[in-house]
Amino acid sequence: MKQIPMTVRGAELLREELEFLKNVRRPQIIDAIAEAREHGDLKENAEYHAAREQQGFCEGRIQEIEGKLGNAQVIDVAKMTNNGKVIFGATVGLVNIDTDEEVTYRIVGDDEANIKEGLISVNSPIARGLVGKSVDDSVSIITPGGKVEFDIISVEYQ
């Protein structure tokens, strides 16, 4: 499997979720299965089947997270030399040339992306258009909503 780029914070969040699933959620589900078994016939026991389904989802997510962490390439941008170029993990300030609207995005791994928080995936059209560019560069990016032009006003490594 190929390496999965993620920020230090993204790796921490996955580890926290993994710990919660293993130490809190898994025991809760096991208890729910045991309690449902006590209610008798398993063929028509909806509680039992629901708990088993939850167990499947939980175990699947545990495996998924362990796989991602096992293949993670954790990148600490704060330790990198700021040469002004947009790279993975950088926080980029942009001005939309058409609307004069200012936006700030941080380029993160796929699992960390959340556009409402200004976190965009390194594989998104905007991030792909920004990587390698510098402050004062103008970029034209083809997005699902059409062509958008931005001026890069800041690049920070936090």
UniProtKB/Swiss-Prot annotation:
- Please list every transmembrane segment annotated in the UniProt record, as residue ranges: none
Annotated GO biological process = DNA-templated transcription elongation; regulation of DNA-templated transcription elongation
| Name the record gives this protein | Transcription elongation factor GreA
Q: Keywords in alphabetical order, please.
A: DNA-binding, Transcription, Transcription regulation
Checking InterPro entries in the record gives: GreA/GreB_C_sf, TF_GreA/GreB_CS, Tscrpt_elong_fac_GreA, Tscrpt_elong_fac_GreA/B, Tscrpt_elong_fac_GreA/B_C, Tscrpt_elong_fac_GreA/B_fam, Tscrpt_elong_fac_GreA/B_N, Tscrpt_elong_fac_GreA/B_N_sf
Tell me the Gene3D superfamilies matching this sequence. Answer: Transcription elongation factor, GreA/GreB, C-terminal domain (3.10.50.30), Transcription elongation factor, GreA/GreB, N-terminal domain (1.10.287.180)
Among NCBIfam families, the record links this protein to: greA, PRK00226.1-2, PRK00226.1-4, PRK00226.1-5
Q: Which GO terms describe its molecular function?
A: DNA binding; RNA polymerase binding
Q: Which family does it belong to?
A: Belongs to the GreA/GreB family.
**What function does the entry list?**
Necessary for efficient RNA polymerase transcription elongation past template-encoded arresting sites. The arresting sites in DNA have the property of trapping a certain fraction of elongating RNA polymerases that pass through, resulting in locked ternary complexes. Cleavage of the nascent transcript by cleavage factors such as GreA or GreB allows the resumption of elongation from the new 3'terminus. GreA releases sequences of 2 to 3 nucleotides.
